[in-house]
Amino acid sequence: MLKTDLIFERENFSHHDFQNATFKNCHFYMCSFDHADLRDAKFIDCRFIESKALEGCSFRFANLKDASFTNCMLAMSLFNGANCMGLELRKCDLKGANFQGANFANRVSNTMFFCSAFITGCNLTYCNFERVLLEKCDLFENRWNGANLAGATLKGSDLSRCEFSPEQWGTFNVEQCDLTHVELDGLDIRRVSLFGVKICDWQQEQLLAPFGLIIL
């Protein structure tokens, strides 16, 4: 199913089956996709919020397994409780979106799980990722400034060329992450575990300057 150049306003798509559907250059304003089946669905150049609006679309408890959003406006969207395993978000504006309770993990047992997500080149400023598991995922070239990452674990993920706010360091797990080409201002190595983290040579100076050390 291919849909192009359509506008939907206040439509209730709850519990609808959009599996494998493709939407291109479509606009969705104040629409609900709660509990919808969006597995393997593709959204390209779509908008999910009107200009200057304060409320986006809702994907709460939707099945977004392996769904793909490319160059989409998803600001203020709600993804609470959604199945986001394998979700792909490329070059999207997600400012203020809420992912609290979203699931990016496949649990093999109570203690074993693996995550899958491809979130790259996105505006994630002021998003809510509180306590979200995003381990060993592609998360590079994103803007995370002001996002709520409290209790989240991004362990082992590629965070290269991302942007963070100084106050965010220490609120989430970055062990074994790729932090190359990331500004590390505000990161205190005394309280943030950098076990297995990758950085560039020039980043050493940022980490050690607060201690009065000069890197030659």
From Swiss-Prot:
Keywords: Antibiotic resistance
Taxonomic superkingdom: Bacteria
Cited SUPFAM superfamilies: Pentapeptide repeat-like
Keyword Transmembrane: no
InterPro entries linked to this entry: 5peptide_repeat, Pentapeptide-BTB/POZ_domain
GO biological process, one term: response to antibiotic
Function of the molecule: Has no effect when overexpressed in E.coli. When Cys-115 is mutated to Tyr and overexpressed it increases (fluoro)quinolone resistance in E.coli up to 16-fold for ciprofloxacin, levofloxacin and nalidixic acid.
Sequence similarity: Belongs to the pentapeptide repeat protein family.
Protein name as it appears in the record: Pentapeptide repeat protein VPA0095
Organism: Vibrio parahaemolyticus serotype O3:K6 (strain RIMD 2210633)
